[in-house]
Amino acid sequence: MEIKLDLTCDLKNFINKDKQYTIPIFIPHKGCPNSCIFCNQKKISGQIKNVDLSDVDNIIKTYLSYYKDLSKKIEIAFFGGSFTGIDINLQIDYLKVAKKYIDNGEVNSIRLSTRPDYISEEILVMLKEYGVDTIELGVQSMDDKILSIAKRGHTSQDVIRASKLIKKYNIRLGHQIMIGLPNSTMETEIYTIKECLKLKPAQLRIYPVYVIEDSELYDMYNGREYTPLSIAEAVKRCVAVVKECQSEDVAIIRLGLQSTSEITSSNSNIFGPVCDNFAEYVISAIKIGRASCRERV
């Protein structure tokens, strides 16, 4: 794969200054009011079974038993659905299980992911009470036409409102964006990251769009209504997005989807820029662009 880029940027955004252990707890499709066209959370998380309270407790205990470096911070992370869209009592039950490990000193913090339109002051007060210190918003795009086509069910204004509220409550803000959604272009990707950076997220995840079975996007792909990005184009767009982050104090904590038994380049039923080491391609492209610029100076 040949990628020709002309970029002057470094890799400071990829440096994780606060190295820590993360205990991931996936709650597939819990709390989501609708199905976005790209979504099949059970395949994305590699998990079919729903998670009950005893599962949460067992997952935490299992991960804690693996950790050897006790000097590292430990974080519990609820992923896989819109956490704050779950019934409020179930949210509290999940968080109570996690918080007891904070109270006994075994865990330092809790993070979760959710939709921008499922954030309110009432929710944030509760989350603060139970030790949540990072909230990642599924932004995906700041282009309202793209959000509508993707059937997200929220607008860019919801992202702005939720981001400001989260920062008001001194909770660390994370944004998740997707590269290659239907109707997207290099220009809309740049617009999205610029609009996100105005909201000062502390952390960023960048995901190229994969076409996954049993999603509406899969039907669009089969009907030739959608063409996924090539790896080369996805890398090119991601490098441009990363370049926009260089002057900002934002940590890029993931590039590409986490590989699972379902989400892997060996799965012939996943289409798009599927690559088990996508971040390495992006970082290599940045380094190549930086070196080529220095050679001309």
List PLM regions with ranges:
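C-terminal accessory region of radical SAM enzymes
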Residues: V242-Q258
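Radical SAM enzyme [4Fe-4S]-AdoMet core and its adjacent flexible, acidic
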Residues: P208-Q246, S265-I283
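Short glycine-enriched loops at secondary-structure junctions
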Residues: P28-G31, Y207-I212, Q258
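Conserved catalytic loop of SAM-dependent methyltransferase domains
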Residues: S259-I263
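Signature of the chemotaxis receptor cytoplasmic signaling rod
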Residues: M1-I3
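Residue-level detector of conserved catalytic or cofactor/ligand-binding positions
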Residues: I288-V297
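N-terminal pre-triad scaffold of radical SAM enzymes
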Residues: D6-S45, D57, T62-T84, S113-R115, ...
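Conserved non-cysteine loop/helix-boundary elements of the Radical SAM core domain that shape
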Residues: I44-N58, Y66, G80-V209, E213-E233
